[in-house]
Amino acid sequence: MVLGLVALVAACDASGTADVGTIDRADASVDAPGPDAPGLDAPGLDAPASRDDAPSTGLLRDRHPGDEGLADDPAVLFFDDFESGWGRWDAPSADTAHLFVETSDVAHAGARQLRATVTHDQLRDDMYIGAAPRVLLSRPVPDLYVRLHARFVGIAPNPHHWIRFAAGDAGFSSSGLANTVPPGDQGFWFDWDASLENTFSFYAYWFRMRSGRCNDGTAVPGCAGDQGTTYYYGNTFVPPDQAEGGFERDQWICLELGMHVNTVGESDGALEAWIDDVPVGRFGPGEPVGTWLRDRFHPGGCSFSACTEPVPFEGFEFRSEEDVLFKELFLDSYYQLDTWERSRDELVSRGLTPMESSTILYDDVVAATERIGCRR
């Protein structure tokens, strides 16, 4: 049972039918005010960047070995190595019940790291918990790269949903919009999720997203594979070139995500990912070749009876207005009691002994307008 399937992505059987989840990042108990809190989009931000901003050659880390001086590079929109404690995120501003900036001998670099821990007991008391530092970037941009080093501790359920990247106009908030289609002239977002199999996926909401109701992604009653109810949970894209067996736990992983808005009126938006500096997948115009089935794009095609012949991916039409730009990052470890317990039970069925808590460590987080590369 893969968590990414158990959690709210419709899992198709050989006939093309699916089981539908009912909750997707509910109004959770979080460690910070929501992104629509007063002051988040206050005046004073720098003017939006444009594609005409000329990038430098090479990776940012090549110009800043050991991340030395990286925070001051003009391409950098956000930087936190946690060495100076809290203060760089909009919220929280201090440790919480689930988030801790701490000195550690396993910190990726330097002496300190961020730890996000949610326990089974805490979930019994509050069945939706988000351990979610958030930050509004120094300016909204059309092309964004985010690099972080993460470490999944021990054998434990992974988050129901993980890191969120939000784009929008000045007034758009991506919170509390599960099972909705966001307006193209207001905003969109995606999560970077980790399954129980320790593989990653994009989980995207945008105004051209597909429904899980029908095989072809529409929501027309009586369609082929009709599920009988209309729903719009995130569309799933699993980068195809990840390591067999997934990532290693109890080791630092370098993750970098690239995201690009579309030209208004075109489908040339893209999402891409690197793990430990190795490209593992890009979803953009013409790549990869694969098959849509309901609300999931299958790189290389799929084998269910409802699957059609693979074709090149069409690209993303994320937005319909120019002022919809990438603006906010949530380092969100979001858990639900029901999926946490099902994942724990699945681990037990595999002969494993999961912990009674889920912990992820973070270090060396950077957002920029250029490729960053892993810290070295």
Label the predicted regions.
Residues 1, 6-62, 67-68:
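Ser/Thr-rich, Pro/Gly/Ala-heavy low-complexity intrinsically disordered linkers and tails
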Residues 51-94:
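Extracellular carbohydrate-recognition regions
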Residues 67-68, 132-138, 239-246:
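Beta-strand-rich interaction surfaces with strong enrichment in secreted/lumenal proteins
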Residues 82, 252-311:
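Carbohydrate-binding surfaces in secreted/extracellular proteins
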Residues 86-122:
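Extracellular glycan-recognition surfaces and repeat-rich motifs
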Residues 107-231, 358-361, 366-375:
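Secretory/extracellular carbohydrate-interaction modules
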Residues 141-143, 149, 239-258, 268:
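Trp-centered recognition loops
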Residues 285-360:
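Flexible glycan-contacting loops in extracellular carbohydrate-active proteins
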